[in-house]
A protein has these predicted regions:
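Extracytoplasmic gating/loop element in the C-terminal half of outer-membrane beta-barrel translocons
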Residues: 639, 643-652, 660, 807-898, ...
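Periplasm-facing N-terminal accessory domains of Gram-negative outer-membrane beta-barrel systems
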Residues: 2-128, 186, 200-202
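Gram-negative outer-membrane beta-barrel transporters
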Residues: 692-823
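Extracytoplasmic beta-strand/coil segments of soluble accessory domains associated
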Residues: 133-189, 221-231
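Solvent-exposed loop/turn elements at secondary-structure boundaries
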Residues: 142, 155, 549-576, 580-725, ...
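Transmembrane beta-barrel wall of Gram-negative outer-membrane proteins
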Residues: 238, 264-349, 368-396, 577
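A beta-strand signature from Gram-negative outer-membrane beta-barrel systems
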Residues: 96, 148-151, 187, 201-244, ...
């Protein structure tokens, strides 16, 4: 007997897998009518089918897990395979060769290796429960598993609600997009983008990441699709209890921290528990998991040392409490019907840094967040016959976020640091979603077909206290002159250009019912043309009902009606064809694959909030002149009636000067679209390791940017106001070689190597919401084309788990990446140097000498608007590479036949490499990127010198995160 095992990602339900293959006799002839039975080991649930005339068998919509697969046919020996592993979003191919009747035979597969797949050319991978359990994930967040696979990296922070969230940047996109599902349920933030809820790490059964070219069954993403399946109970009562601890005695400090300051204490404790078992053996099962994290952490901040005229790196307290819970019940109601019910809850509060417009913020720029999330899911799977299965899902989710400043006050935006309280808070958002989906899969001859549809309605609500306390735009980090003639030079002598404050400072901006419905349908056919060649053909349609604010269009400001062109309607032509091929040689050693797909990204409801909120009426911004306008160049002083640093909002109004303007949604705005192409190969190496290489080319169109298109007189502000058009007029490009090597051994041992060689380009440091910045020249958007802020040309990740002598297990993750680029900003940090493209640091300029040569040439031509720019230090840096090795050493002790205790020691960043990196989209490099002058006096030599530029400000991961200073963590896990 011969059984060939293969695992392959293909067109499967987002929460299930499949078993398929071909049965032949000893001569190679197909055997029809073979009864194929798959029995799930944990529960005894059975699915059956028979082979067709070609000997082909397919069982779809299987719950991921371990199965016994049996073959029975008249005149042949019965055969069976034990421990066949069905993975999420993947097909386990079992090809069997039957011989004439004799003794029965069972093939024991304790842990299948990785084989060359057949049937699909998807770019991605699956991370199983054993990997999730053994690898040292620094934050114990399931989304960190995405970084083990090529083409994925952390994304910059893009919104105050996401300061403690793992956001994934896939295939060059920046984190707002992507599609994350848990058990097939949408887990995405439709309000601002990015992921929504976390779940206990020990509740994850499997994690699948489709980085590129996924099937028509999955959509609403122009980047990647993440499918997570939670664990379920079995016929045996089983559970675990874990604790992980670390504190400042086991933890280093960031290299940028000023050691002359006292470091606040910090610690973290994480507790996790699981328990599951039968309600009625063979019929119903339950499972529950809970995790609690109590963290007294710190965040990296800056402190203005006025006496020393420098900005010192410091730390500020950032406590966090996070409870995660999950419970599910699975019922085998009949032999054909399976019901599933799952509930998730997250209750989290934290203090963290707010979203920054500068490279670093002060301690007062922290914010206090309160997040509540819950979701429920019901699933009904019905086996309609030996070749067809239908799955119906209904779900509800609710998310509420409230953010307040740690202390009220105005925002002080210095060129090099953001001080005071963030102007973005207080704020709160609410999202409620109802979702319904149905999918039908059936096998007809050589065709494996799936067809389905989805409907969801998302209600969004914004409660925004933005600009209530105001914002002061300063032009220098420290005062240079005694402006007020009081005999000393201090902060009362600081120069500031403008102030911005809400014209209604006593009330929040409330935007209710920012809602939209989503409708989609798909058909997918995986056609096995020959035993070696499969064609993947699919078509998906998607529609968002109201992301263009159709329901609020009649209420837009009449003074901007002339700027709307044409009629506003829904984007109705979002058809996404998918076409691919996969060819495998007869020996099953080599697969060639490739294809094309058209993918549409979601448009977040924040777009609606911009048109409704920044309409020139709902949130009027008073822009007033700063004391710069009152400066007497002859005396170097300001008159007594000028606005002061202590009382800055007394200047005369400058209508339209620096405010966000009136935002309008272009009537032709469309969903961002990406054309994805790939061509690749998989090859089985000696020792059953599999090497995969994919050439990927993605071209994005219709991405959103805000462009100033004119001015109108706004009676609310008493003068002209600029009009900003939110339009689908820019694109993206991503070209990459994605490589992976995977090998599985017995007893949970495995090795994975992932490498990405990539180039990512776009037109903005935020690829959806152009709120805080716009193009240098609104009539020449090509000047905005440049690297994404988190582009890493090279990224290598090695992960694995191995058994050592003395029954020790060593597991690790080693991440090495090249430097990200850096924007180079003007001395007042208002925008980048206008003669430069975006993010040219560490790209066009490799070192300070090259930048200084450019600046010298620019100054010789008159500088910017006749003012020369300062040169930087010879040792100034733009960016830093990344290198972090995380290890776990553990040993399991068997206390009884069913109870074990595992002792765990983890070390993160073993070699204590300093990895300078930022968090904000404004400056992700972590180095000071403002050409801040040493002196604001044109007669002083410091006017043409910027000593602070290129200085390291923040390190990757802060204190606790990945790539941060070396840290040890101790753990203990009991299992039964």
């Amino acid at each position: 007997m011969l059984l060939t095992l293969t695992a392959v990602a293909r067109a499967q339900d987002a929460a299930t897998g499949a078993v398929a293959g071909r049965v032949t006799d000893a001569s190679g002839a197909a055997v029809a009518g073979v009864k194929v039975k798959a029995t799930r080991t944990a529960t005894g649930a059975v699915r059956e089918t028979t082979t067709d005339a070609d000997g082909t068998h397919v069982l779809t919509s299987l719950v991921p897990g371990e199965y016994r697969i049996e073959f029975e046919a008249a005149g042949f020996n019965p055969r069976a395979l034990d421990h066949g592993l069905v993975q999420v979003g993947a097909r386990l191919t079992v090809d069997a060769v039957l011989d004439v009747q004799g003794r029965a035979e069972t093939i024991e597969v304790s842990e299948p290796g990785v084989s060359v797949p057949t049937g699909n050319g998807l770019v991605g991978g699956v991370v199983g429960a054993g990997v999730v359990e053994n690898l040292p994930l620094n934050g114990r967040n399931f989304l960190e598993l995405a970084f083990l696979l090529p083409g994925n990296a952390p994304a910059p922070n893009f919104d105050p609600t996401k300061t403690n969230v793992v956001a994934i940047s896939s295939a060059g996109q920046l984190g707002r997009g992507g599609n994350i599902t848990i058990d097939g349920q949408d887990n995405n933030d439709d309000v601002v983008g990015g992921p929504l809820a976390n779940l206990p790490q020990d509740a994850v059964q499997e994690f699948q990441m489709a980085t590129n070219r996924f099937s028509a069954e999955q959509g609403r993403s122009a980047a990647s699709a993440v499918n997570v399946v939670t664990r379920s109970g079995g016929d045996t009562l089983a559970g675990s209890l874990s604790v992980f601890v670390r504190d400042d005695a086991l933890q280093g400090l960031p290299a940028t921290f000023d050691r002359t300051q006292e470091a606040p204490p910090f610690s973290r404790q994480q507790y996790s528990a699981t328990l599951g078992g039968p309600i009625a053996r063979g019929r119903a099962w339950w499972f529950a998991a809970a995790e609690y994290r109590n963290q007294d952490s710190v965040v990296q901040t800056g402190t203005r040392d006025v006496a020393a005229r420098t900005i010192r790196q410091s730390l500020a307290a950032a406590p966090l409490n996070d409870f995660l819970g999950m419970a599910r019940i699975d019922v085998r109601a009949t032999d054909q019907d399976t019901l599933g019910f799952r509930y998730l809850v997250q209750d989290e509060d934290d203090v963290a840094a707010s979203t920054l417009d500068r490279s670093i913020g002060s301690a007062t720029q922290r914010q206090s967040s309160d997040n509540r999330h819950q979701q429920g899911l019901a699933t009904w799977t019905r086996v309609l016959g030996t070749t067809s299965v239908n799955t119906l899902r209904a779900s509800y989710s609710n998310f509420r976020n409230v953010i307040d400043p740690v202390a009220p006050g105005r925002q002080l935006t210095f060129p090099s640091i953001q001080d005071g309280a963030s102007f973005r808070v207080p704020q709160g958002t609410t999202q409620t979603r109802w979702q319904f989906s149905d999918s039908l899969s059936w096998v007809k001859g050589a065709h494996s077909l799936r067809v389905g549809a989805e409907y969801s309605h998302t209600y969004g609500r914004f409660d925004l206290g933005v600009f209530r306390e105001g914002r002061v735009e300063l032009v220098q980090d420290f005062a240079q002159f005694d402006l007020n003639r009081d005999g000393r030079v201090d902060d009362d002598d600081l120069l500031f250009a403008v102030t911005l404050r809400s014209g209604k400072p006593d009330q929040n901006l409330l935007l209710d019912d920012c809602s939209s419905s989503y409708i989609s349908g798909f058909v997918q056919d995986d056609w096995r043309v020959t035993p070696q060649l499969t064609l993947n053909v699919g078509l998906r349609y998607e529609l968002d009902s109201d992301v263009k604010n159709i329901s609020g269009y009649a209420d837009t400001n009449p003074i901007v009606q002339a700027f709307y062109q044409g009629d506003r309607g829904r984007d109705l032509d979002n058809f996404g064809p998918r076409l691919g091929f996969a060819w495998t040689n007869r020996r099953g050693m080599l697969q060639l694959h490739g294809g094309f797909g058209l993918y549409y990204d979601r448009v977040t409801l924040e777009i609606i909030s911009l048109e409704r909120g920044l309409d020139g009426r709902a949130l009027p911004i008073e822009v007033r002149a700063g004391n710069v306008f009152f400066l007497d160049p002859g005396t170097g002083s300001v008159p007594p009636f000028a606005p002061t640093f202590a009382d800055p909002f007394t200047g005369f109004i400058l209508p339209g000067a620096g405010a966000s303007g009136i935002n309008i949604i272009d009537n032709s705005l469309e969903n961002p679209t990406v054309q994805q192409y790939n061509l690749g190969a998989r090859y089985r190496l000696p020792g059953d390791a599999v090497l995969q290489l994919d050439l990927v080319h993605n071209r994005g169109t219709h991405f959103i940017i805000g462009r100033t298109v004119g001015e109108v007189f706004n009676p609310v502000v008493g003068g002209p106001d600029r009009v900003v058009n939110l339009e689908s007029s820019v694109g993206t490009r991503y070209d990459a070689l994605l490589t992976s090597l995977e090998k599985r051994f017995g007893r949970g041992q495995q090795l994975r190597v992932s490498y990405s060689l990539a180039r990512a380009r776009n037109y903005a440091n935020d690829d959806q919401i152009p709120f805080s910045s716009g193009p240098i020249d609104p009539n020449d958007l090509e000047r905005e084309y440049g690297p994404t802020p988190n582009e890493q040309r090279h990224r290598l990740v090695l992960s694995g788990s191995f058994l050592l002598p003395l029954e020790l297990r060593l597991s690790g993750i080693w991440t090495i990446a090249s430097a990200v680029p850096m924007d180079i900003l003007m001395p007042d940090a208002s925008h980048r140097v206008p003669t430069l493209s975006r993010n040219v640091g560490a790209r066009e300029f490799e070192n300070a000498a090259e930048l200084n040569a450019y600046l010298t040439s620019l100054n010789a031509k008159g500088g910017i608007d006749g003012v020369p720019l300062p040169l930087v230090r010879e040792d100034a840096r733009f960016s830093d590479s990344f290198d972090s090795l995380d290890l776990r050493l553990s040993r399991r002790f068997a206390l009884t036949s069913s109870l074990s205790l595992e002792a765990i020691v983890e070390c993160f960043n073993v070699f204590n490499v300093t990895n300078v990196l930022g968090v904000s989209k404004t400056n992700y490099s972590g180095f000071a990127n403002v050409l801040a002058r040493d002196s604001s006096d044109p007669a002083d030599a410091g006017f043409l010198r910027s000593s602070s530029f290129g200085r390291a400000l923040t390190t990757a991961g802060g204190v606790f995160g990945s790539g941060g200073p070396r840290a040890f963590q101790l753990g203990l896990r009991a299992q039964f």
